[in-house]
Amino acid sequence: ADTIVAVELDTYPNTDIGDPNYQHIGINIKSIRSKATTRWNVQDGKVGTAHISYNSVAKRLSAIVSYPGGSSATVSYDVDLNNILPEWVRVGLSASTGLYKETNTILSWSFTSKLKTNSTADAQSLHFTFNQFSQNPKDLILQGDASTDSDGNLQLTRVSNGSPQSNSVGRALYYAPVHVWDKSAVVASFDATFTFLIKSTDSDIADGIAWFIANTDSSIPHGSGGRLLGLFPDAN
C-alpha cells in the first residue's frame, strides 16, 4: 500500500470513519482517520487559500485554511516524517465526490522544500509555482478524472458544463520527486500553498480536497472515491 501523509479539507462529515460531525480540516498519517482536526466551514463558490508547512526542527505539520475577510481554520500535529515517509516522495493534490458532489477546482499551487544535509554545506531544494495550469501539463502527473481546463484551472474531479459530477476521483502530482530526508537523519522543511474553489449545485456537498505526500509511484487506490478522498483503499 502507499505511504501517505495528507491534509484534508473535508466538506462532508463521515462520522462512521471517525470524522467530527461538521466540516473540518484534518491531518492524516497513513489513514483516512485524521490524527488532528479542527472545524472549518466551506464557502460555496468562493476562492479559499490553504497553506501547509512542516517544521523539521519542531517536527510539526501545520495547516491553515482561510477565505478573504473570513476567519481562518488552523490545525497542527507533531510528527517525525522520516519515520513515516520514504526518502524520496511526490507531492500532490487529490479530491473526490460521491453521491453528493462539488467542484474541486485548483487555481494555483506552489511548493518549496529545503533539505539541509550534514554531509554538504549546501541545501537541496525544490520549488515550483503554478499560477495557472496549461492544457497539456508536462510537469504534472494527472490521475483518474483530473484535468486542466481552458481557463487555466486544474479540475481534480469531473465537471460537465460547469456542473460537478458525482462519483468522481482525481489527483495531480508534481512530476519531480522531492528528497524529504537523508540517511544522516536530516529532514526537509517545506511549505505549500494552493488556492481552491469548491462549489455545488446541491444543498449537500462532498467530499473534499486533500494535499498529500506519497511514495513516488503512488496511484489512486481501488475503491478510494467518496469519503476516502482518492487517498486510501479503506477506512482503517
UniProtKB/Swiss-Prot annotation:
<keyword id="KW-0800">Toxin</keyword>
<feature type="binding site">
    <location>
        <begin position="99"/>
        <end position="100"/>
    </location>
    <ligand>
        <name>a carbohydrate</name>
    </ligand>
</feature>
<keyword id="KW-0464">Manganese</keyword>
<feature type="binding site">
    <location>
        <position position="24"/>
    </location>
    <ligand>
        <name>Mn(2+)</name>
    </ligand>
</feature>
<dbReference type="GO" id="GO:0046872">
    <property type="term" value="F:metal ion binding"/>
</dbReference>
<dbReference type="GO" id="GO:0090729">
    <property type="term" value="F:toxin activity"/>
</dbReference>
<keyword id="KW-0430">Lectin</keyword>
<feature type="binding site">
    <location>
        <position position="34"/>
    </location>
    <ligand>
        <name>Mn(2+)</name>
    </ligand>
</feature>
<feature type="binding site">
    <location>
        <position position="10"/>
    </location>
    <ligand>
        <name>Mn(2+)</name>
    </ligand>
</feature>
<comment type="subunit">
    <text>Equilibrium between homodimer and homotetramer. Oligomerization is pH-dependent with homotetramers forming at pH 6.5 and above.</text>
</comment>
<dbReference type="InterPro" id="IPR019825">
    <property type="entry name" value="Lectin_legB_Mn/Ca_BS"/>
</dbReference>
<feature type="binding site">
    <location>
        <position position="12"/>
    </location>
    <ligand>
        <name>Ca(2+)</name>
    </ligand>
</feature>
<feature type="binding site">
    <location>
        <position position="10"/>
    </location>
    <ligand>
        <name>Ca(2+)</name>
    </ligand>
</feature>
<feature type="binding site">
    <location>
        <position position="8"/>
    </location>
    <ligand>
        <name>Mn(2+)</name>
    </ligand>
</feature>
<dbReference type="InterPro" id="IPR013320">
    <property type="entry name" value="ConA-like_dom_sf"/>
</dbReference>
<feature type="binding site">
    <location>
        <position position="19"/>
    </location>
    <ligand>
        <name>Ca(2+)</name>
    </ligand>
</feature>
<dbReference type="InterPro" id="IPR001220">
    <property type="entry name" value="Legume_lectin_dom"/>
</dbReference>
<feature type="binding site">
    <location>
        <position position="14"/>
    </location>
    <ligand>
        <name>Ca(2+)</name>
    </ligand>
</feature>
<comment type="similarity">
    <text>Belongs to the leguminous lectin family.</text>
</comment>
<dbReference type="InterPro" id="IPR000985">
    <property type="entry name" value="Lectin_LegA_CS"/>
</dbReference>
<keyword id="KW-0465">Mannose-binding</keyword>
<keyword id="KW-0479">Metal-binding</keyword>
<comment type="function">
    <text>D-mannose/D-glucose-binding lectin. Has anti-inflammatory activity in rats. Induces histamine release in mast cells from rat. Induces lymphocyte proliferation and IFNG production.</text>
</comment>
<dbReference type="GO" id="GO:0030246">
    <property type="term" value="F:carbohydrate binding"/>
</dbReference>
<dbReference type="Pfam" id="PF00139">
    <property type="entry name" value="Lectin_legB"/>
</dbReference>
<feature type="binding site">
    <location>
        <position position="207"/>
    </location>
    <ligand>
        <name>Ca(2+)</name>
    </ligand>
</feature>
<keyword id="KW-0106">Calcium</keyword>
<dbReference type="GO" id="GO:0005537">
    <property type="term" value="F:D-mannose binding"/>
</dbReference>
<feature type="binding site">
    <location>
        <position position="19"/>
    </location>
    <ligand>
        <name>Mn(2+)</name>
    </ligand>
</feature>
<dbReference type="InterPro" id="IPR050258">
    <property type="entry name" value="Leguminous_Lectin"/>
</dbReference>
<feature type="binding site">
    <location>
        <position position="12"/>
    </location>
    <ligand>
        <name>a carbohydrate</name>
    </ligand>
</feature>
<protein>
    <recommendedName>
        <fullName>Lectin alpha chain</fullName>
    </recommendedName>
</protein>
<feature type="binding site">
    <location>
        <position position="227"/>
    </location>
    <ligand>
        <name>a carbohydrate</name>
    </ligand>
</feature>
